[in-house]
Amino acid sequence: MAKQDIEASGPEAGEFSAKDYTDPPPAPLIDADELTKWSLYRAVIAEFIATLLFLYITVATVIGYKHQTDAAASGPDAACGGVGILGIAWAFGGMIFILVYCTAGISGGHINPAVTFGLFLARKVSLVRALLYIIAQCLGAICGVGLVKGFQSAYYVRYGGGANELSDGYSKGTGLAAEIIGTFVLVYTVFSATDPKRSARDSHVPVLAPLPIGFAVFMVHLATIPITGTGINPARSLGAAVIYNKDKAWDDQWIFWVGPLIGAAIAAAYHQYVLRASATKLGSYRSNA
């Protein structure tokens, strides 16, 4: 027997082929018992507050940036001031990092209907929980933007209210594609960063998971702010549209729902049926897909 054959039949081969990991069971489609548990309502409250804080900080950053760079308000050197697109991207990505870290152990730290939808399709959450999360996220977003308008009433409408709108020069198809791809990047990162198989092998992964998720949001914003202002989060887009309440924001609103939901669905399918399926063939873990 060749030396490499002996090595392949040793402990390392056993570690490779052994089913040292078992997926958690899929969440039930409808779990009525959840409605009797305080943990569900605590998680819903956490999603509401997290989305409120997310929209308050990020939209306030956008309004502040536009005010600082308004030549009429800040003088001829306005273009050199403000946080710039890079700073706005950091505000969105940084807040996601902070809020996911704070709420991951309570609600899973979704803060985004597209993320919730993707996890629902992958049977990570029940339909009941998914619906309550999405409602809480949308209400939290509306309240968060409402706070911005209340605190910055002099500038809110003048500088666009932080609403997502398709930029001039881009077609609706381009905007939709940008939202699909951007949300795919985010939800794919969520699945990869929170993969229980990876967590089982590396104990530090759950602690670090918010970092790549926040960084994904940051990178997507750099790419898509010039196109759509970056939605990738239907609650974020809806909250700003409700408070800003201008025709352009409402006319483009469908892009910021259809695009993210399609992107989330593609990411869920890719993770469940391509990446996990290949792992199953190698025998490294059992798939419930």
Curated annotation (Swiss-Prot):
Gene3D superfamilies: Glycerol uptake facilitator protein
UniProt short sequence motif NPA 2, positions renumbered to this chain: 233-235
Alphabetical UniProt keywords: Cell membrane, Membrane, Repeat, Transmembrane, Transmembrane helix, Transport
Chief subcellular location: membrane
An annotated Gene Ontology molecular function: water channel activity
Keyword RNA-binding: no
Name recorded for this polypeptide: Aquaporin PIP2-3
The encoding gene: PIP2-3
